[in-house]
Protein backbone atom coordinates (compact mmCIF):
# COMPACT_ATOMS: atom_id res chain seq x y z
CA UNK A 1 0.00 0.00 0.00
CA UNK A 2 1.34 3.40 -1.01
CA UNK A 3 0.59 6.76 0.54
CA UNK A 4 -0.13 9.84 -1.52
CA UNK A 5 2.37 12.72 -1.46
CA UNK A 6 1.24 15.90 0.24
CA UNK A 7 0.99 17.75 -3.07
CA UNK A 8 -0.69 14.80 -4.76
CA UNK A 9 -3.86 14.86 -6.79
CA UNK A 10 -5.74 11.70 -7.66
CA UNK A 11 -8.07 11.56 -10.65
CA UNK A 12 -10.35 8.79 -11.78
CA UNK A 13 -10.13 8.32 -15.51
CA UNK A 14 -12.13 6.23 -17.94
CA UNK A 15 -11.09 5.86 -21.57
CA UNK A 16 -13.88 6.21 -24.09
CA UNK A 17 -12.22 4.16 -26.86
CA UNK A 18 -13.75 0.79 -27.70
CA UNK A 19 -11.89 -2.51 -27.75
CA UNK A 20 -10.62 -3.72 -31.14
CA UNK A 21 -11.76 -7.32 -31.56
CA UNK A 22 -9.21 -8.00 -34.30
CA UNK A 23 -6.16 -6.29 -32.80
CA UNK A 24 -3.28 -8.74 -32.16
CA UNK A 25 -0.01 -7.91 -30.37
CA UNK A 26 2.16 -5.05 -31.57
CA UNK A 27 -0.62 -3.25 -33.45
CA UNK A 28 -0.98 -5.81 -36.24
CA UNK A 29 -4.35 -4.33 -37.22
CA UNK A 30 -5.07 -1.40 -39.52
CA UNK A 31 -2.67 1.56 -39.56
CA UNK A 32 -5.42 3.68 -37.98
CA UNK A 33 -5.84 1.16 -35.13
CA UNK A 34 -2.09 1.08 -34.64
CA UNK A 35 -1.80 4.84 -34.52
CA UNK A 36 -4.80 5.17 -32.20
CA UNK A 37 -3.43 2.54 -29.82
CA UNK A 38 0.04 4.04 -29.90
CA UNK A 39 -1.17 7.55 -29.09
CA UNK A 40 -3.53 6.23 -26.42
CA UNK A 41 -0.72 4.21 -24.85
CA UNK A 42 1.73 7.10 -25.03
CA UNK A 43 -0.70 9.46 -23.31
CA UNK A 44 -1.47 6.83 -20.67
CA UNK A 45 2.18 6.10 -19.92
CA UNK A 46 3.11 9.77 -19.79
CA UNK A 47 0.23 10.38 -17.38
CA UNK A 48 0.70 7.43 -15.05
CA UNK A 49 4.30 6.25 -15.44
CA UNK A 50 6.28 9.48 -15.41
CA UNK A 51 7.62 11.13 -12.27
CA UNK A 52 6.40 14.59 -13.08
CA UNK A 53 7.78 16.69 -10.23
CA UNK A 54 6.06 20.04 -10.53
CA UNK A 55 4.23 19.22 -13.77
CA UNK A 56 0.47 19.10 -13.82
CA UNK A 57 -1.28 15.76 -13.88
CA UNK A 58 -1.70 14.52 -17.43
CA UNK A 59 1.07 16.66 -18.87
CA UNK A 60 3.22 15.04 -21.58
CA UNK A 61 6.78 14.93 -20.24
CA UNK A 62 8.95 12.10 -21.54
CA UNK A 63 9.29 10.97 -25.15
CA UNK A 64 11.36 8.46 -27.01
CA UNK A 65 11.10 4.75 -27.86
CA UNK A 66 13.47 3.42 -25.20
CA UNK A 67 11.72 5.45 -22.51
CA UNK A 68 8.35 4.15 -23.67
CA UNK A 69 9.49 0.51 -23.60
CA UNK A 70 10.71 1.02 -20.03
CA UNK A 71 7.37 2.48 -19.03
CA UNK A 72 5.49 -0.39 -20.68
CA UNK A 73 7.54 -2.81 -18.60
CA UNK A 74 6.74 -0.83 -15.44
CA UNK A 75 3.04 -0.98 -16.26
CA UNK A 76 3.17 -4.70 -16.97
CA UNK A 77 5.03 -5.38 -13.74
CA UNK A 78 2.61 -3.25 -11.70
CA UNK A 79 -0.46 -5.10 -13.02
CA UNK A 80 1.16 -8.53 -12.87
CA UNK A 81 1.31 -9.01 -16.63
CA UNK A 82 4.03 -10.80 -18.60
CA UNK A 83 6.83 -8.23 -18.87
CA UNK A 84 7.68 -7.86 -22.58
CA UNK A 85 7.93 -4.13 -23.17
CA UNK A 86 5.44 -4.58 -26.04
CA UNK A 87 1.95 -3.17 -26.42
CA UNK A 88 0.23 -6.52 -26.70
CA UNK A 89 -3.51 -7.02 -26.41
CA UNK A 90 -3.43 -7.72 -22.66
CA UNK A 91 -1.48 -4.54 -22.02
CA UNK A 92 -3.86 -2.48 -24.16
CA UNK A 93 -6.76 -4.07 -22.29
CA UNK A 94 -5.36 -2.65 -19.04
CA UNK A 95 -4.73 0.75 -20.63
CA UNK A 96 -8.37 0.99 -21.78
CA UNK A 97 -9.92 0.16 -18.41
CA UNK A 98 -11.64 2.87 -16.35
CA UNK A 99 -9.27 3.92 -13.60
CA UNK A 100 -8.18 6.50 -11.08
CA UNK A 101 -5.54 8.82 -12.38
CA UNK A 102 -2.95 9.12 -9.64
CA UNK A 103 0.36 7.82 -11.11
CA UNK A 104 1.40 4.24 -10.39
CA UNK A 105 5.08 5.08 -9.97
CA UNK A 106 6.66 6.59 -6.86
CA UNK A 107 10.04 6.84 -5.19
CA UNK A 108 8.96 5.36 -1.88
CA UNK A 109 6.31 3.02 -0.60
CA UNK A 110 5.44 5.70 1.92
CA UNK A 111 6.07 9.08 0.37
CA UNK A 112 8.24 11.65 2.18
CA UNK A 113 6.20 13.33 4.87
CA UNK A 114 3.55 10.60 4.92
CA UNK A 115 0.72 13.12 4.44
CA UNK A 116 -2.20 12.57 6.77
CA UNK A 117 -4.66 14.56 8.81
CA UNK A 118 -3.40 15.65 12.21
CA UNK A 119 -6.81 15.43 13.88
CA UNK A 120 -9.35 12.67 14.35
CA UNK A 121 -12.57 14.54 13.59
CA UNK A 122 -12.84 15.84 10.04
CA UNK A 123 -15.60 17.95 8.56
CA UNK A 124 -17.00 17.58 5.08
CA UNK A 125 -19.37 19.67 3.03
CA UNK A 126 -21.17 18.96 -0.23
CA UNK A 127 -21.31 22.38 -1.86
CA UNK A 128 -22.58 21.43 -5.34
CA UNK A 129 -24.78 18.50 -6.36
CA UNK A 130 -25.30 16.54 -9.58
CA UNK A 131 -28.60 16.41 -11.51
CA UNK A 132 -28.04 12.68 -12.06
CA UNK A 133 -29.13 11.84 -8.50
CA UNK A 134 -31.30 13.34 -5.79
CA UNK A 135 -29.47 15.31 -3.08
CA UNK A 136 -30.50 12.65 -0.55
CA UNK A 137 -28.89 9.93 -2.70
CA UNK A 138 -25.69 11.95 -3.02
CA UNK A 139 -25.65 12.60 0.73
CA UNK A 140 -26.06 8.89 1.42
CA UNK A 141 -23.36 7.84 -1.05
CA UNK A 142 -20.84 10.25 0.48
CA UNK A 143 -21.71 9.23 4.02
CA UNK A 144 -21.35 5.53 3.23
CA UNK A 145 -18.07 6.11 1.39
CA UNK A 146 -16.58 7.94 4.37
CA UNK A 147 -17.95 5.35 6.76
CA UNK A 148 -16.06 2.65 4.83
CA UNK A 149 -12.82 4.26 6.02
CA UNK A 150 -13.86 5.31 9.52
CA UNK A 151 -14.82 1.71 10.25
CA UNK A 152 -11.11 0.84 10.19
CA UNK A 153 -9.41 3.85 11.78
CA UNK A 154 -10.13 6.33 14.62
CA UNK A 155 -11.49 9.01 12.31
CA UNK A 156 -14.92 10.62 12.52
CA UNK A 157 -16.56 12.63 9.75
CA UNK A 158 -19.03 15.39 10.57
CA UNK A 159 -21.03 17.00 7.81
CA UNK A 160 -21.44 20.78 7.82
CA UNK A 161 -23.79 22.80 5.66
CA UNK A 162 -21.92 26.09 5.49
CA UNK A 163 -18.42 27.52 5.59
CA UNK A 164 -15.12 25.82 4.85
CA UNK A 165 -14.79 22.12 5.64
CA UNK A 166 -11.71 19.89 5.72
CA UNK A 167 -13.07 17.93 2.76
CA UNK A 168 -15.00 20.10 0.31
CA UNK A 169 -17.04 17.99 -2.12
CA UNK A 170 -18.52 19.32 -5.34
CA UNK A 171 -19.66 18.35 -8.82
CA UNK A 172 -17.95 20.54 -11.39
CA UNK A 173 -17.67 20.96 -15.16
CA UNK A 174 -14.70 21.91 -17.31
CA UNK A 175 -12.25 24.40 -15.84
CA UNK A 176 -13.32 24.89 -12.24
CA UNK A 177 -10.39 26.78 -10.79
CA UNK A 178 -7.97 24.15 -9.50
CA UNK A 179 -5.80 23.75 -12.63
CA UNK A 180 -7.26 20.29 -13.31
CA UNK A 181 -10.21 20.84 -15.68
CA UNK A 182 -12.73 18.10 -16.42
CA UNK A 183 -13.15 16.93 -19.99
CA UNK A 184 -16.77 15.86 -20.37
CA UNK A 185 -18.39 12.41 -20.43
CA UNK A 186 -16.23 9.29 -20.08
CA UNK A 187 -12.98 11.08 -19.53
CA UNK A 188 -11.74 12.09 -16.11
CA UNK A 189 -14.39 11.09 -13.59
CA UNK A 190 -13.13 12.70 -10.41
CA UNK A 191 -10.08 13.91 -8.58
CA UNK A 192 -9.08 14.34 -4.95
CA UNK A 193 -6.28 16.20 -3.21
CA UNK A 194 -4.12 14.66 -0.48
CA UNK A 195 -4.40 15.90 3.15
CA UNK A 196 -3.20 19.44 3.70
CA UNK A 197 -4.17 23.09 3.77
CA UNK A 198 -6.17 24.86 1.07
CA UNK A 199 -7.28 22.30 -1.51
CA UNK A 200 -6.03 19.46 0.69
CA UNK A 201 -8.68 16.74 0.99
CA UNK A 202 -11.03 18.39 -1.50
CA UNK A 203 -12.80 15.99 -3.84
CA UNK A 204 -14.35 16.96 -7.17
CA UNK A 205 -16.60 14.91 -9.46
CA UNK A 206 -17.23 15.56 -13.15
CA UNK A 207 -20.82 16.74 -13.46
CA UNK A 208 -20.92 15.57 -17.08
CA UNK A 209 -20.95 11.92 -15.99
CA UNK A 210 -24.03 9.84 -15.24
CA UNK A 211 -23.78 9.14 -11.52
CA UNK A 212 -25.87 6.40 -9.92
CA UNK A 213 -26.17 4.24 -6.82
CA UNK A 214 -26.44 1.13 -9.00
CA UNK A 215 -24.44 -0.62 -11.72
CA UNK A 216 -25.49 1.64 -14.59
CA UNK A 217 -23.39 4.70 -15.32
CA UNK A 218 -20.74 5.28 -12.69
CA UNK A 219 -21.47 4.20 -9.15
CA UNK A 220 -20.96 7.25 -6.95
CA UNK A 221 -20.21 5.25 -3.82
CA UNK A 222 -17.46 3.30 -5.59
CA UNK A 223 -15.74 6.38 -7.00
CA UNK A 224 -16.22 8.43 -3.81
CA UNK A 225 -14.85 5.68 -1.55
CA UNK A 226 -11.75 5.38 -3.75
CA UNK A 227 -11.22 9.15 -3.93
CA UNK A 228 -11.69 9.58 -0.18
CA UNK A 229 -8.86 7.07 0.22
CA UNK A 230 -6.66 9.57 -1.59
CA UNK A 231 -8.12 12.46 0.44
CA UNK A 232 -7.00 10.60 3.56
CA UNK A 233 -3.49 10.02 2.21
CA UNK A 234 -3.46 6.72 0.32
CA UNK A 235 -2.03 6.10 -3.15
CA UNK A 236 -2.71 3.02 -5.26
CA UNK A 237 -2.39 -0.62 -4.34
CA UNK A 238 -1.13 -3.42 -6.58
CA UNK A 239 -3.66 -5.80 -5.00
CA UNK A 240 -6.50 -6.30 -7.55
CA UNK A 241 -8.99 -6.89 -4.72
CA UNK A 242 -8.24 -3.55 -3.05
CA UNK A 243 -10.51 -0.53 -3.23
CA UNK A 244 -7.37 1.51 -4.00
CA UNK A 245 -6.48 -0.61 -7.05
CA UNK A 246 -6.12 1.82 -9.97
CA UNK A 247 -8.88 0.53 -12.26
CA UNK A 248 -12.59 1.16 -11.74
CA UNK A 249 -14.69 -1.78 -10.56
CA UNK A 250 -18.25 -1.50 -9.29
CA UNK A 251 -18.68 -2.01 -5.54
CA UNK A 252 -22.07 -2.69 -3.97
CA UNK A 253 -22.54 0.07 -1.36
CA UNK A 254 -24.71 -2.13 0.84
CA UNK A 255 -22.79 -4.60 2.94
CA UNK A 256 -19.44 -3.27 1.68
CA UNK A 257 -16.44 -4.05 3.85
CA UNK A 258 -13.07 -2.42 3.32
CA UNK A 259 -10.68 -5.02 1.82
CA UNK A 260 -7.75 -6.16 3.96
CA UNK A 261 -5.14 -4.37 1.86
CA UNK A 262 -6.93 -1.04 2.26
CA UNK A 263 -7.33 -1.62 6.00
CA UNK A 264 -3.61 -2.29 6.28
CA UNK A 265 -2.77 0.87 4.35
CA UNK A 266 -5.07 3.27 6.16
CA UNK A 267 -4.11 1.87 9.56
CA UNK A 268 -0.45 2.44 8.70
CA UNK A 269 -1.34 6.14 8.71
CA UNK A 270 -3.92 6.45 11.49
CA UNK A 271 -3.74 3.26 13.54
CA UNK A 272 -6.64 0.88 14.21
CA UNK A 273 -10.02 1.99 15.49
CA UNK A 274 -10.56 1.19 19.14
CA UNK A 275 -13.79 -0.65 19.82
CA UNK A 276 -15.89 -0.59 22.95
CA UNK A 277 -17.29 -4.08 23.30
CA UNK A 278 -17.51 -4.37 27.06
CA UNK A 279 -19.44 -2.62 29.75
CA UNK A 280 -18.68 1.00 30.51
CA UNK A 281 -16.43 1.89 33.39
CA UNK A 282 -18.51 2.64 36.46
CA UNK A 283 -16.73 4.33 39.39
CA UNK A 284 -16.95 2.80 42.87
CA UNK A 285 -19.12 5.58 44.18
CA UNK A 286 -20.14 9.08 43.08
CA UNK A 287 -17.20 11.05 41.67
CA UNK A 288 -15.99 13.91 43.82
CA UNK A 289 -16.54 16.52 41.16
CA UNK A 290 -18.08 19.92 41.92
CA UNK A 291 -19.43 20.12 38.35
CA UNK A 292 -21.45 16.89 38.72
CA UNK A 293 -25.12 17.83 38.24
CA UNK A 294 -27.25 17.59 41.37
CA UNK A 295 -29.71 15.15 39.90
CA UNK A 296 -31.67 14.85 43.16
CA UNK A 297 -32.56 18.53 43.12
CA UNK A 298 -36.34 19.01 42.98
CA UNK A 299 -36.14 20.76 39.61
CA UNK A 300 -33.75 18.34 37.92
CA UNK A 301 -34.49 16.75 34.55
CA UNK A 302 -32.92 14.44 31.96
CA UNK A 303 -31.68 15.19 28.46
CA UNK A 304 -32.36 11.68 27.14
CA UNK A 305 -33.49 8.26 28.36
CA UNK A 306 -33.20 4.94 26.54
CA UNK A 307 -33.13 1.21 26.98
CA UNK A 308 -29.83 -0.45 26.05
CA UNK A 309 -30.08 -4.20 26.27
CA UNK A 310 -31.52 -4.98 29.70
CA UNK A 311 -30.56 -1.64 31.19
CA UNK A 312 -31.94 1.88 31.34
CA UNK A 313 -29.64 4.82 30.60
CA UNK A 314 -30.37 8.37 31.81
CA UNK A 315 -28.38 11.28 30.33
CA UNK A 316 -27.80 14.72 31.80
CA UNK A 317 -25.11 17.14 30.55
CA UNK A 318 -21.84 15.14 30.42
CA UNK A 319 -23.02 12.37 32.79
CA UNK A 320 -25.19 9.30 32.41
CA UNK A 321 -26.71 6.92 34.97
CA UNK A 322 -27.14 3.24 34.29
CA UNK A 323 -29.52 0.87 36.08
CA UNK A 324 -31.14 -2.53 35.69
CA UNK A 325 -34.79 -2.24 34.68
CA UNK A 326 -36.12 -3.92 37.84
CA UNK A 327 -33.39 -2.94 40.30
CA UNK A 328 -32.78 0.37 42.05
CA UNK A 329 -29.48 -0.61 43.68
CA UNK A 330 -26.01 -0.04 42.29
CA UNK A 331 -26.92 3.10 40.35
CA UNK A 332 -23.80 5.22 39.80
CA UNK A 333 -22.99 8.16 37.53
CA UNK A 334 -20.35 7.90 34.84
CA UNK A 335 -19.05 10.32 32.24
CA UNK A 336 -20.47 9.90 28.75
CA UNK A 337 -16.97 9.93 27.28
CA UNK A 338 -15.98 6.86 29.29
CA UNK A 339 -18.40 4.74 27.26
CA UNK A 340 -19.33 6.88 24.25
CA UNK A 341 -16.23 8.99 23.46
CA UNK A 342 -17.69 10.40 20.26
CA UNK A 343 -20.78 11.81 21.99
CA UNK A 344 -18.78 13.88 24.50
CA UNK A 345 -21.75 15.47 26.32
CA UNK A 346 -25.28 16.85 26.08
CA UNK A 347 -27.12 14.05 24.28
CA UNK A 348 -30.41 15.43 22.91
CA UNK A 349 -32.31 12.17 22.43
CA UNK A 350 -31.84 8.42 22.28
CA UNK A 351 -33.79 5.26 21.52
CA UNK A 352 -33.18 1.55 20.98
CA UNK A 353 -34.57 -0.84 18.36
CA UNK A 354 -34.11 -4.04 20.33
CA UNK A 355 -34.98 -6.32 17.39
CA UNK A 356 -31.94 -4.96 15.55
CA UNK A 357 -29.74 -4.74 18.61
CA UNK A 358 -29.07 -1.10 17.73
CA UNK A 359 -29.39 2.16 19.64
CA UNK A 360 -29.49 5.67 18.20
CA UNK A 361 -28.07 8.75 19.92
CA UNK A 362 -28.86 12.27 18.72
CA UNK A 363 -26.94 15.48 19.18
CA UNK A 364 -27.74 18.55 17.09
CA UNK A 365 -28.25 17.65 13.42
CA UNK A 366 -26.31 14.38 13.78
CA UNK A 367 -26.87 10.92 15.20
CA UNK A 368 -24.71 7.92 16.08
CA UNK A 369 -25.53 4.21 16.04
CA UNK A 370 -24.28 1.71 18.60
CA UNK A 371 -24.50 -2.01 19.17
CA UNK A 372 -24.39 -2.22 22.91
CA UNK A 373 -21.60 0.17 23.87
CA UNK A 374 -19.74 -0.25 20.56
CA UNK A 375 -20.01 2.70 18.20
CA UNK A 376 -20.89 1.79 14.62
CA UNK A 377 -19.05 4.19 12.35
CA UNK A 378 -19.09 7.97 12.09
CA UNK A 379 -21.97 10.35 12.85
CA UNK A 380 -24.78 10.57 10.34
CA UNK A 381 -27.23 13.35 9.55
CA UNK A 382 -30.76 13.39 11.00
CA UNK A 383 -32.03 14.26 7.53
CA UNK A 384 -31.55 10.60 6.64
CA UNK A 385 -34.85 10.07 8.48
CA UNK A 386 -36.66 12.60 6.28
CA UNK A 387 -36.80 15.59 8.60
CA UNK A 388 -37.32 18.99 6.94
CA UNK A 389 -34.20 21.12 6.87
CA UNK A 390 -35.52 23.59 9.42
CA UNK A 391 -35.31 20.88 12.10
CA UNK A 392 -31.88 21.34 13.68
CA UNK A 393 -32.16 18.98 16.66
CA UNK A 394 -34.39 16.31 18.23
CA UNK A 395 -35.76 16.88 21.74
CA UNK A 396 -36.77 13.28 22.46
CA UNK A 397 -37.34 9.93 20.77
CA UNK A 398 -39.09 6.69 21.69
CA UNK A 399 -39.42 3.42 19.78
CA UNK A 400 -42.72 1.52 20.02
CA UNK A 401 -41.99 -2.18 19.70
CA UNK A 402 -45.50 -3.37 18.73
CA UNK A 403 -45.96 -0.94 15.85
CA UNK A 404 -42.28 -0.61 14.88
CA UNK A 405 -42.78 3.14 14.86
CA UNK A 406 -40.34 5.64 16.33
CA UNK A 407 -41.74 8.93 17.58
CA UNK A 408 -39.50 12.01 17.38
CA UNK A 409 -40.42 15.05 19.47
CA UNK A 410 -39.40 18.50 18.25
CA UNK A 411 -40.73 21.48 20.19
CA UNK A 412 -44.47 21.02 20.73
CA UNK A 413 -44.82 18.60 17.79
CA UNK A 414 -43.83 15.04 17.00
CA UNK A 415 -43.04 12.95 13.91
CA UNK A 416 -43.74 9.26 13.32
CA UNK A 417 -41.04 7.21 11.58
CA UNK A 418 -41.75 3.74 10.16
CA UNK A 419 -38.74 1.56 11.01
CA UNK A 420 -39.85 -1.19 8.61
CA UNK A 421 -40.24 1.09 5.58
CA UNK A 422 -37.39 3.36 6.72
CA UNK A 423 -39.37 6.54 6.04
CA UNK A 424 -41.51 9.14 7.78
CA UNK A 425 -45.25 8.55 8.00
CA UNK A 426 -47.55 10.94 6.15
CA UNK A 427 -49.48 13.80 7.78
CA UNK A 428 -46.81 14.59 10.36
CA UNK A 429 -45.78 16.50 12.44
CA UNK A 430 -48.72 16.58 14.85
CA UNK A 431 -49.26 18.50 18.08
CA UNK A 432 -48.01 16.48 21.07
CA UNK A 433 -50.49 17.66 23.71
CA UNK A 434 -53.43 17.12 21.34
CA UNK A 435 -52.39 13.55 20.54
CA UNK A 436 -51.22 12.49 24.03
CA UNK A 437 -53.90 13.45 26.52
CA UNK A 438 -52.58 14.52 29.92
CA UNK A 439 -49.00 15.14 28.80
CA UNK A 440 -48.08 18.78 29.39
CA UNK A 441 -45.00 20.76 28.45
CA UNK A 442 -42.15 20.10 26.06
CA UNK A 443 -40.89 16.51 25.98
CA UNK A 444 -37.26 16.21 27.12
CA UNK A 445 -36.98 12.41 26.94
CA UNK A 446 -39.15 9.33 26.46
CA UNK A 447 -38.92 5.57 26.80
CA UNK A 448 -41.34 2.64 26.38
CA UNK A 449 -41.42 0.08 29.18
CA UNK A 450 -43.91 -2.72 29.93
CA UNK A 451 -46.50 -1.35 27.52
CA UNK A 452 -46.35 2.22 28.83
CA UNK A 453 -44.65 5.28 27.41
CA UNK A 454 -42.88 7.40 30.00
CA UNK A 455 -42.64 11.04 28.93
CA UNK A 456 -40.06 13.11 30.80
CA UNK A 457 -40.83 16.83 30.87
CA UNK A 458 -38.70 18.86 33.27
CA UNK A 459 -38.95 17.36 36.78
CA UNK A 460 -42.03 15.29 35.87
CA UNK A 461 -42.34 11.86 34.27
CA UNK A 462 -45.78 11.06 32.79
CA UNK A 463 -46.80 7.40 32.66
CA UNK A 464 -48.93 7.12 29.52
CA UNK A 465 -51.20 4.13 28.86
CA UNK A 466 -51.30 3.53 25.09
CA UNK A 467 -54.52 1.50 25.32
CA UNK A 468 -56.43 4.04 27.43
CA UNK A 469 -54.71 6.86 25.52
CA UNK A 470 -54.26 8.84 28.71
CA UNK A 471 -51.80 9.55 31.52
CA UNK A 472 -52.33 7.17 34.45
CA UNK A 473 -49.77 8.63 36.88
CA UNK A 474 -47.14 11.33 37.26
CA UNK A 475 -43.76 10.60 38.86
CA UNK A 476 -40.68 12.63 39.70
CA UNK A 477 -38.17 12.31 36.87
CA UNK A 478 -35.27 11.68 39.23
CA UNK A 479 -37.15 8.97 41.13
CA UNK A 480 -35.97 6.63 38.38
CA UNK A 481 -32.43 6.78 39.73
CA UNK A 482 -33.25 6.50 43.41
CA UNK A 483 -33.87 10.13 44.42
Swiss-Prot record:
Name of one Pfam family that matches: Peptidase_M10
Cofactors required: Zn(2+); Ca(2+)
Active site: 227
Any one GO BP annotation for this protein: extracellular matrix organization
Keywords associated with the record: Autocatalytic cleavage, Calcium, Disulfide bond, Extracellular matrix, Hydrolase, Metal-binding, Metalloprotease, Protease, Repeat, Secreted, Signal, Zinc, Zymogen
Residue span(s) of the pro-peptide: 23-107
Protein name in the entry: Matrix metalloproteinase-20
Organism from which the protein derives: Sus scrofa
Gene name linked to the record: MMP20
